[in-house]
Amino acid sequence: MRFDFHSRKVKLLYFEEKGARKYPAEVIDAFFDAMSTIKAAQDIRDLYKFKSLHFEKLSGARQNDRSIRLNKQWRLTLRIEKDDNGDFILILDIEDYHH
């Protein structure tokens, strides 16, 4: 599935592995695994098939956002967007949900 980055820091992490030291090693590994799964997905429904991702829609003020759990503490947040070429995933951030 197509994706783009809202966050410059996450984009740099993905393409150049810059800023990796800011996160636990298991979070970095899970981030790259999640990105591989996103890239391989044909559409958004494919992400729901992988129960290990815990792909879910957020609620409240973040009702348009979704998340993938990287571990019990960290999540990759994203949003489904549309353009002339169809749906794509906008990667928002890697967030610590305990803070």
Could you describe each region identified by the protein language model?
Residues 35, 52-59, 74-84:
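Short, surface-exposed, charge-dense and proline/glycine-enriched linear segments
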Residues 29-32, 52, 68-72:
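Generic alpha-helical scaffold signal
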Residues 43-66:
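A short, surface-exposed loop/turn module that caps and links secondary-structure elements
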Residues 4, 25, 49-52, 88:
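Non-catalytic, surface-exposed connector residues within folded enzymatic/regulatory domains
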Residues 8-9, 18, 42, 50-53, ...:
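Residue-level signal for pocket-adjacent positions within structured domains
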Residues 38:
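Conserved phosphate-interacting/catalytic interface
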Residues 66-99:
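Enriched for short, Lys/Arg-rich terminal
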Residues 1-35:
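Arg/Lys-rich, positively charged N-terminal/basic patches that mediate binding to nucleic acids
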